[in-house]
Amino acid sequence: MMLKNDFNVLGQIAWLWANSPMHRNWSVSLLMKNVIPAIENDQYLLLVDDGFPIAYCSWAKLTLESEARYVKDTNSLKIDDWNAGDRIWIIDWIAPFGDSSLLYKHMRQRFPYDIGRAIRIYPSKKDTGKIIYLKGGKITKKVAEKTFLQYEQELITALQ
């Protein structure tokens, strides 16, 4: 259940969606489906500068099964999927005012020893996504690469 402050957060995130060239034409129902679970599970980071929201990121902690569904259909996440596993997926990354590097820095601090993945959608190819990998600020490149490879192999097997 959302609390009073959660509605303020929701409004700030909605404002960022409205200012994002990629998100602004997405439906309100998609905003609710992607944002409310993040707020309810405290799985988001909202950067604010001088009282104004400047960037937002949300993540889900998926199981291998929900991850396989998500890769096939990014609209497949259910509320129970958001905090069901240990496989971190970035759901939204919104920085419409050029603060993506700052958001990345904060996320690396938030998850210093973790790795995560995201489906990167390019504005010119809206129907095509690419899985990208992110690593925490204190995890070694060697450990991250080993974990990425393991997760990739497990996902390939799950998708078959």
Curated annotation (Swiss-Prot):
UniProt similarity note: Belongs to the RTX toxin acyltransferase family.
Keyword Zinc-finger: no
Enzyme class: transferase
Cellular localisation: Cytoplasm
Subunit field text: Homodimer.
InterPro entries: RTX_toxin-activating_protC_bac
Listed name of the protein: RTX-II toxin-activating lysine-acyltransferase ApxIIC
One GO BP annotation of this record: killing of cells of another organism
Source species: Actinobacillus pleuropneumoniae (Haemophilus pleuropneumoniae)
Membrane-spanning ranges: none
